[in-house]
């Protein structure tokens, strides 16, 4: 049976998410991000297109590296202003039945005890349609604003994230037994206290006696996403992630990451197929090639190199305004980096431009050759990019048996891993915390 | 012109909020608190009844004082399990147009920088219908679970809350100027960077350079509620609160608090009428007195003394299981305290039982004699208590000109303080932070 492709909409609760400069495009409605209807309309559109999930990126700091200032990011709305993505979920869940919501949250700034409750609450309210994209954040401005005194190195932030997840797993998987809530009216026992356990976590970064504040939600643990392609990031993915958002735009790079993470997963006793691999993709589709190119040119017209340099500075720490084009960063010249960023050719992700058939061919090729399971679909204009994809590419993928015609029933985890799999599999590291008793 | 009474529904994102034992009542649907539709149906009902707001209490710890254990609270669902109230708001805002949402959040556990963004996000999404009930929390179990190493004394927690609010005011009122966002397409300027200011806050508890992550929302600062009646709590209310949730069930007590807080407010240069006073009230109304008494008896039947003792223990720190009835706590014997709690006579708040006329009389009397402006309406059964009030008491109040017939247009602050008052008045302490410039 042909493998169905999973499609997520890649979004962010701000004006300028990724295609910087395009807020100026006449068809772009991103300025409506503060309006609840922008989001409920988007969720309904995505459900109409049978998308798996809305993937919401997030940052809690400002890009202030480029030109040693935050002004370019602020001027061009490069992920600032930026609102809290968790606040959007319940309204979007109310207007949909199947769409899932993968929301980014950093383990660097706020305590796991409060976060574990937020995610359990959202898993309840969405009836099991919530996922968490775990990030370890790297923005100095966020460190300062959250009063982080001791700035941890890149890899140690993943060590902290390991323990952060351990605390969450103990709360989600082990603190309340499945049949703790019994609602015994006769004996006035809503919850059997003997089935609610302290977790007594004592670690390097956190002391959390527990118990969890929430009764078990449909998935208990939200579907875990991870998106860091560094060595340490891939190790973290292999240990924790059920879905990985890969970097890279060509088969070789993607395949390397896919194979590497699946291999590492075995070390943790995990079935490598218990991890779905997502690649970012930019799609500009038209009924004809010319129509697609016309759209591309209209986007290129508003494309802002300055905006992308501000984003690049925040993401890498390199202020390219201080370099000459002949300087090198790693193996690439600054001239080449800047040239790449000045063109709309999908600097980080594969760009597929053309007819529905061409786009479907290129997506199918990446899936089959790189061994990935789905895509995070980038937006140029909102909601136009998704409208085009749903009207033109989805039918083509469905014709090839590569995309669902109707939603399957069940939670997000079941839609990814099959009916009945609404909880994490036993080979996941979280499963060891299921039989926590008070004396742990 | 007769003063209109403001009515809030008093709720909590859990099973057992306040009328412990009544989760067993056949008409009570509180077990549906994990279901999004419970909340959207409630919001629609309250808007039908022209309520001002849904007031959501919250705790992030467990009552574990009574019988030196958390078991009674867990067994009887006394505010555990408890989900996060902020996650509910966007769905309820989506199905209503006027109802406001006053949500409780503690200044003790999570950093103001993340909280300021959450509230700005909700003020945007609700189009100016969000309020924040500021609490300084007191539960040891929450202190442990959030890893609070240094437990602050009661009054010092208010000092920290003062600074917490100062940080938030600087972010909400001063960081982004009203016309910072200009959306100048021609010059690719979404936001004028010179109108986005760092706040450079440096205090005893927080260092927050800023700027805020969010563009100005309709109200900028959510409507500020406060609910602590200690000496320090009233001082805090006088300085910050626009709405105060008073303790007390008789005219004398309520009037003392009202007069005291209004007097203190003058010290801060505030017009005392810029503070609305809310008393808690329990209403059991029937078309006839007998019908009301029948309801009361059905509630009394399920009333749980043990549940209330668990709540009392968590709230006061006194484990009454260790006292004999002749012991005294303050000026009241333990026997009297327990006797009060065993009857459904509104242990903390005024109980009004009877016909619509009697209930309206008693509400009008409290408003006129104690100088209060509205009520937080307690629930016995959900949604029955609110349905009865809306069907029987609201028409009676409307007949007397004491209650709106239709909603006024505008934000929550405008509905409280009049059209055009969507931002904090100039006499509020937050106003001083409006002209923050980079060198503050």
UniProtKB/Swiss-Prot annotation, chains A, B:
Optimum pH is 7.5. Changing residue 376 to I: Loss of activity with hexadecane as substrate. 2.9-fold increase in activity toward hexadecane. 2.0-fold increase in activity toward hexadecane. 3.4-fold increase in activity toward hexadecane. Induction: 120-fold increase in transcription when crude oil is used as a sole carbon source instead of sucrose. Changing residue 63 to F: Loss of activity. Can still form dimers. GO terms for cellular component: extracellular region. Belongs to the NtaA/SnaA/DszA monooxygenase family. This is Long-chain alkane monooxygenase. It comes from Geobacillus thermodenitrificans (strain NG80-2). The gene is ladA.
């Amino acid at each position: 049976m042909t493998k169905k492709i999973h499609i997520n909409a890649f979004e962010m609760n701000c004006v300028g998410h990724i295609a910087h400069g395009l807020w100026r495009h006449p068809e772009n409605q991103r300025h409506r991000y503060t309006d609840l209807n922008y989001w409920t309309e988007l969720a309904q559109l995505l459900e109409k297109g049978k998308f798996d999930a809305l993937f919401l990126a997030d940052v809690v700091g400002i890009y202030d590296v480029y030109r040693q200032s935050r002004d370019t990011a602020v001027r061009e709305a490069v992920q600032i202003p930026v609102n809290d993505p968790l606040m959007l979920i319940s309204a979007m869940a109310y207007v949909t039945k199947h769409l899932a919501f993968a929301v980014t949250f950093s383990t660097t700034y706020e305590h796991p005890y409060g976060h574990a409750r937020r995610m359990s609450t959202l898993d309840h309210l969405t009836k099991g349609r919530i996922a968490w994209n775990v990030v370890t954040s790297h923005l100095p401005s966020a460190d300062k604003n959250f009063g982080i005194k001791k700035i941890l190195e890149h890899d140690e932030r993943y060590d902290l994230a390991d323990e952060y997840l351990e605390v969450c797993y103990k709360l989600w998987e082990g603190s309340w037994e499945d049949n703790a809530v019994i609602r015994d009216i006769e004996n006035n026992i809503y919850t059997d206290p003997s089935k609610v356990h302290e977790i007594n976590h004592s670690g390097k970064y956190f002391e959390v006696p527990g118990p969890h504040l929430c009764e078990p939600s449909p998935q208990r643990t939200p579907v875990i996403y991870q998106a860091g392609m560094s060595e340490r990031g891939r190790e973290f993915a292999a240990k924790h992630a059920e879905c990985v958002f890969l970097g890279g735009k060509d088969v070789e790079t993607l395949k390397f990451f896919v194979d590497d993470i699946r291999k590492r997963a075995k070390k943790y006793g995990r079935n490598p197929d218990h991890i779905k691999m997502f690649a970012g993709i930019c799609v500009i589709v038209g009924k004809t090639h010319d129509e697609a190119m016309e759209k591309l040119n209209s986007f290129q017209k508003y494309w802002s190199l300055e905006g992308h340099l501000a984003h690049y500075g925040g993401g890498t720490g390199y202020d390219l305004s201080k370099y000459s084009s002949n300087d090198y960063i790693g193996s690439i010249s600054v001239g080449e980096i800047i040239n790449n960023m000045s063109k709309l050719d999908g600097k980080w992700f594969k760009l597929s431009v053309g007819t529905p058939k061409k786009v479907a061919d290129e997506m199918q090729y990446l899936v089959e050759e790189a061994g990935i399971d789905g895509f995070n679909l980038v937006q140029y204009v909102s909601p136009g990019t998704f409208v085009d994809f749903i009207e033109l590419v989805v039918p083509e993928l469905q014709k090839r048996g590569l995309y669902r015609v109707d939603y399957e029933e069940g939670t997000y985890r079941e839609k990814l891993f099959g009916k009945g799999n609404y909880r994490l599999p036993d080979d996941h590291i979280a499963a060891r915390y299921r039989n926590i008793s008070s004396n742990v």
